[in-house]
Structure formats: structure tokens, C-alpha cells
């Protein structure tokens, strides 16, 4: 039988991809685990891949970056939370910051600065914890897929640096810690947080059943009504402007994730992972620029319908156009390599101008 004729052990070839060394009696050759392995052996291969990792990769201590400052025992947990991937924290935190700044600029009466800072602190903490818990949950669900993608094979669960039971308990504690913050916020915020948690739990399953898992990420737009409710501002008072700002956040999130996920398209096709980058790989430029146009119009109308004027249009909308146009031109013309660094710099520039325009609008209020 197949299990008797073949035994497998993982090796690493020159391009960093896992190969499987197959021993068939006296013959020995290295084969691609997906393409070259006899079909009857594949279930055995998958089971053994789950149990075997490169022993040298279980524990390592980075010599540079944020992870290098952590004790060796905590490095896998830092990797699990993606503390060294600032872009993800930006994507989760900036909607709350924008929501608070927008509320301050459009509220019926000028909100006190100490209240704004208090809510900014609480919602920033929430966004950091939600992002961290979401990453850990995503790795728990995707551990088998991560072992088949070269970019994700070194993640702590995929390489066996953290056990699945330990990661499960750790993830549950993170979600519980995040939910405890809503003891200090209005009840409506807890309801909106529950919606965000639901979609965070749903997200890793999306790539298995739909070509549009990025659309699940639009739930991050709930940060806008949550920020408004935290300050006692009712989104329904200016429902159209609130909806426009939610559309703005949603399209920006989907746009960045769409461009970022291009780097895995070839391997996603082999493994069978679904995404918008895979589905629209032949027209991804058109889709990306369309999302960019929608986000720009949504931001513009969200401000105008909320009573904002020249400072918002010049700085917030203008900065968004310059920042994301630069990002798309660089990323779509030069390919997926280095997309994260380009996204961080361009998005940071855009965010500064978003807040500058909204901050000026708040400052000039009587």
C-alpha cells in the first residue's frame, strides 16, 4: 500500500519552498508535494505535513526590528500577533481615529478635548487588541493552508513554535480583554463591537467559500458609528454623511487588502485559496482604480454633507488623492514586491492629511 511504500520528510530547496523526500524501497528523489506526489499518497502527505516541521525553525530570535527586543520565549507570540507588521494595525486603528476626528468636526456642539482624548485612547486599545486577536484566530483556522504558502510557512503555528491548544486559549483571552474595554463606553458601542468580532471570526473561512473574502473586511467601517456613539453623537442625525464615511473606510480597506494580496496570487491558485486578487487577476488595475475613485467621492460627499468646507476638501480629500494615487501607481506598475512598505508610507501620508483637514475644521469651530 501507499503508506508502506513511501515515507516523507520535509526539506527546503533553494527557493525556500517545502519539498517532500520520498523513499520508495531503494529509490530516493525529491518531489513537489502537490504536483509530483502520487495521488494515492496525498492524504498521507497532508497528515505528515501537519506533524512535521523544520526543527530549526521552531525557535529563532530576530536580530532586527521590533521582535528583536522581545525575550526569545515571547517572539512566537509577537509573530502570532503580527506586532512587526505595522500596516495591519494602521488599517484597524485609522478608522477609529478618523471617526473621532469626524465626530469632533461635525458634532452639533464643540466637544471637549479631554473627552476626545479619552475615547481615542479606549478605541485605539480596542483596535489593537481586535487586530491581534484576529491575526491569532486567522492563523488557527489557516494553519494547514499556511504550511503550503511560502510567505506564511514561517508563521509560529505553521512551524510548530506554538501549540494549537495554547494558541486557542491565548486568542480567547485576547477577545475577552478587548471586550472588557466596553465597560467604559456607552452600551451601543458594545453592540457594534459584537458585529466586528463576528466578522473577524468569519473572515478566515471566507477564502474557502467565496471569491470575495475581502468584502468581509468592510465590517471595519463600523468604527465610524462606534466612534460617534462613544462621544454621544448620533450617526442618524446626519445619516447620509455617516454612510458616505463608512463607504470611504470600507473601500480603502478592501483596496489595500486587494493590492497586498496580489503577492500570493500564484500560490493561492495552486492551493485553491479564493480571493478578489485571484478572481480579478486579469483586471486588477481597473478594479483597484475604481475602488480608489469610489473612496475619494465617498470621502468628499461625507464631508460636504456633514457641513465641512475648504480645509477638509483641500487637506483631507486632496491628501487622500495624492497618497493613494502614489500607492497605486507604485504598486500596480512595479509588481507585488515591496507592496507593504509602499502601502505604509502612502497610507501614513494620506492619514496625516485626513486628520489635518478634520483637525482644522474642529479648531475653527466656535
Curated annotation (Swiss-Prot):
Alphabetical GO biological process terms: terpenoid biosynthetic process; ubiquinone biosynthetic process
- Look up the EC number in the record and give it: 2.5.1.-
The record's Gene3D superfamilies line, in alphabetical order, gives: UbiA prenyltransferase
Keywords, A to Z, come to: Magnesium, Membrane, Transferase, Transmembrane, Transmembrane helix
TM spans (from-to) = 97-117, 121-141, 164-184, 215-235, 239-259, 287-307, 308-328, 346-366
Q: Please summarize what the entry says happens upon disruption of the gene.
A: Impairs the biosynthesis of calidodehydroaustin and accumulates the intermediate compound 3,5-dimethylorsellinic acid.
According to its UniProt record, where is this protein located?
Answer: Membrane
Task: Work out whether the entry's keyword set contains Transferase.
Answer: yes
Name any one Pfam family assigned in the record: UbiA
**What are the names of the required cofactors?**
Mg(2+)
Membrane topology according to the record: Multi-pass membrane protein
Its top-level enzyme class, in one word, is transferase
* Taxonomic superkingdom: Eukaryota
Q: Entry's PANTHER family?
A: POLYPRENYL TRANSFERASE AUSN, PRENYLTRANSFERASES
Function recorded in the entry? Polyprenyl transferase; part of the gene cluster that mediates the biosynthesis of calidodehydroaustin, a fungal meroterpenoid. The first step of the pathway is the synthesis of 3,5-dimethylorsellinic acid by the polyketide synthase ausA. 3,5-dimethylorsellinic acid is then prenylated by the polyprenyl transferase ausN. Further epoxidation by the FAD-dependent monooxygenase ausM and cyclization by the probable terpene cyclase ausL lead to the formation of protoaustinoid A.
Any extra remark in the record? In A.calidoustus, the austinoid gene cluster lies on a contiguous DNA region, while clusters from E.nidulans and P.brasilianum are split in their respective genomes. Genetic rearrangements provoked variability among the clusters and E.nidulans produces the least number of austionoid derivatives with the end products austinol and dehydroaustinol, while P.brasilianum can produce until acetoxydehydroaustin, and A.calidoustus produces the highest number of identified derivatives.
* Family recorded in the similarity comment: Belongs to the UbiA prenyltransferase family.
* Designated name of the protein: Polyprenyl transferase ausN
Organism expressing this protein natively: Aspergillus calidoustus
Upper lineage: Eukaryota, Fungi, Dikarya, Ascomycota, Pezizomycotina
Amino acid at each position: 500500500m501507499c503508506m508502506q511504500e513511501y515515507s516523507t520528510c520535509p526539506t527546503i530547496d533553494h527557493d525556500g519552498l517545502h519539498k517532500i523526500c520520498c523513499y520508495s524501497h531503494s529509490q530516493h528523489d525529491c518531489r513537489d508535494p502537490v504536483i509530483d506526489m502520487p495521488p494515492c499518497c496525498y492524504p498521507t502527505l497532508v497528515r505528515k505535513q501537519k506533524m512535521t516541521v523544520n526543527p530549526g525553525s521552531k525557535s529563532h530570535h530576530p536580530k532586527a526590528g521590533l521582535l528583536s527586543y522581545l525575550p526569545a520565549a515571547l517572539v512566537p507570540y509577537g509573530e502570532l500577533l503580527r506586532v512587526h507588521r505595522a500596516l495591519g494595525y494602521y488599517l484597524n486603528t485609522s478608522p477609529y481615529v478618523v471617526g473621532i476626528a469626524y465626530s469632533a468636526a461635525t458634532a452639533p456642539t464643540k466637544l471637549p478635548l479631554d473627552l476626545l482624548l479619552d475615547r481615542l485612547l479606549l478605541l485605539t486599545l480596542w483596535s489593537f487588541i481586535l487586530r491581534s486577536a484576529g491575526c491569532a484566530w486567522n492563523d488557527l483556522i489557516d494553519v494547514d493552508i499556511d504550511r503550503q504558502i511560502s510567505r506564511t510557512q514561517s508563521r509560529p503555528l505553521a512551524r510548530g513554535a506554538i501549540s494549537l491548544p495554547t494558541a486557542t486559549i491565548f486568542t480567547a483571552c485576547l477577545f475577552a480583554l478587548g471586550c472588557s474595554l466596553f465597560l467604559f463606553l456607552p452600551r451601543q458601542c458594545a453592540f457594534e463591537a459584537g458585529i466586528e468580532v463576528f466578522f473577524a471570526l468569519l473572515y478566515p473561512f471566507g477564502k474557502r467559500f467565496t471569491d470575495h473574502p475581502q468584502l468581509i473586511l468592510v465590517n471595519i467601517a463600523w468604527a465610524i458609528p462606534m466612534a460617534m456613539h462613544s462621544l454621544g453623537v448620533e450617526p442618524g442625525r446626519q445619516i447620509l454623511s455617516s454612510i458616505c464615511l463608512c463607504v470611504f473606510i470600507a473601500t480603502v480597506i478592501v483596496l489595500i487588502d486587494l493590492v497586498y494580496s496580489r503577492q500570493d496570487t500564484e500560490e493561492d491558485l495552486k492551493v485553491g485559496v479564493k480571493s478578489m486578487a485571484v478572481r480579478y487577476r486579469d483586471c486588477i488595475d481597473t478594479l483597484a482604480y475604481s475602488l480608489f475613485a469610489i473612496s475619494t467621492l465617498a470621502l468628499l460627499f461625507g464631508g460636504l454633507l456633514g457641513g465641512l468646507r475648504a480645509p477638509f476638501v483641500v487637506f483631507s480629500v486632496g491628501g487622500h488623492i495624492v497618497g493613494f494615487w502614489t500607492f497605486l501607481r507604485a504598486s500596480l506598475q512595479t509588481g507585488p514586491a515591496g507592496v507593504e512598505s509602499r502601502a505604509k508610507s502612502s497610507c501614513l501620508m494620506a492619514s496625516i492629511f485626513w486628520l489635518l483637514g478634520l483637525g482644522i475644521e474642529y479648531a475653527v469651530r466656535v
